[in-house]
Amino acid sequence: MVPEGGSNFFHNMTMVIDGHTGVEHNIPVAPVYKDVTELWGTSKVGYTPTLIVNYGGLNAEYYWYQKTNVWENKKLLQFTPRAIIDSRSRYRMMAPDEDYENDHILTSKTVKNLADNGVKINMGAHGQLQGMGAHWELWSIHQGGMSNLETLKTATINSANYIGAGKDIGSLEKGKLADILVLEKNPLDDIQNSNTLLYTIANGRMYDSASMNEVGNEPKPRKKFYWENSNYNVSFPWHEESDSFMYHQCCGAMHN
């Protein structure tokens, strides 16, 4: 377990000086200068900026809700009730691009500066939206100027080393566990290709990402989610029209 900085810059720097394993959540100051980069870069203290809930400005989460139609993501809707997705995504907070440039993207540029000075950066998505949050965090880290390869390392070997599991996972090497993500497109060409997952191999079993059914040597369909179970008293029909849960009222709009 590692503590977070709590959006307090002086607390963050004290954590670095004290030799904490890492700082969770971004520091609320951007940009930073040589005093911070040299101190942090020589400390071996990790950094998990969690831009998706960016301290000190607009969150990256708002950016990706604004820039993508989340309610149209068919794969996401396989694993999350539509009422939950609609309520989070169809009514969006909108902001000018320059506001994001001065908020989570500026923070991401500071992350890149720290990485260039020796700080190991890790990807952590805060659990904002299972299925997309990790991708959004990855793409947000990339917005700061890291190369595609550097960005991918934050989600793989850097994070594995950070939690003490780097000898077992985090890279494809002889002797490590064969837990593998199989993508349709190469994220080294476009970082958003991280979202083209075909198969997940974990603990010697392979799963189809579109259905979560086990495939390969021992095919086995997954069990139904609670909202797919015929014995479940549903409060809404499953996968109806995308606007079917919007209840307009005289004084505004309400949604599940």
Region locations from a protein language model:
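Divalent metal-coordination and catalytic microenvironments
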Residues: 23, 47, 126, 141, ...
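Acidic, glycine-enriched loop/beta-strand segments at the rims
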Residues: 132, 147-152, 162-197
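Short aromatic-centered micro-motifs
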Residues: 200
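Short catalytic-loop micro-motif centered on adjacent basic/acidic residues
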Residues: 1-3, 22-25, 123-124
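Active-site neighborhoods of metal-dependent hydrolases
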Residues: 26-144, 217-219, 223, 228-256
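Structural recognition of alpha->loop->beta junctions
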Residues: 10-32, 118, 143-151
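Divalent metal-binding pocket/active-site signature
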Residues: 1-15, 53-54, 105
